[in-house]
Amino acid sequence: MDHDSYSDGYLRDILEGVRTIAVVGASPRRERPSHGVMAYLQRHGYRAIPVNPNAAGDRINGETCYGALAEVPEPIDMVDVFRRSAAAGDAVDQAIVVGAKIVWMQLGVRDDAAAARAEAVGLKVVMNRCPAIEIPRLGLPPR
């Protein structure tokens, strides 16, 4: 897959097909982009579950934060990665292990080797994009 360009149809299929999104790197700090994007996803009807080992057990946007994807007690459709590119591979590998269907790496986050590992086992991958930008750009209504 060409990760420099995604068709609107590809992004739309992903965003219309997912329900539960684990936000890896979610922050309890309101000024952090991960906090705002998680809240945006919730307002649009997605179940957004925070994952951050530094905030495990805390509540972020009304949801319990988990220390790792494997601790989330329900199936995860998509993993939204708010980590530096150098740390994204670990989140992708965890997404593979827990059976997520999609890995979405946020703006500025790209790991081609991790993307290849995910795609090799059937996951869809998006890199260097933000769902909170793509949802309104595509005209997707709240769920």
Over which residues does each language-model region extend?
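Glycine-rich, highly charged phosphate/nucleotide-binding loops
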Residues: 1-7, 58-74, 80-89
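Alpha-helix C-terminal capping/helix-to-coil transition sites in glycosyltransferase folds
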Residues: 17, 74-78, 99
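NAD(P)-binding Rossmann-fold cofactor-contacting core
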Residues: 29-32, 39-59
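General beta-strand structural signal in soluble alpha/beta enzymes
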Residues: 50-51, 105, 125-128
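Short acidic, glycine/proline-enriched helix-loop-strand junctions
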Residues: 74, 111-135
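ADP-ribose/adenylate-binding Rossmann-like module
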Residues: 95-118
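A charged, well-structured terminal subsegment
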Residues: 134-143
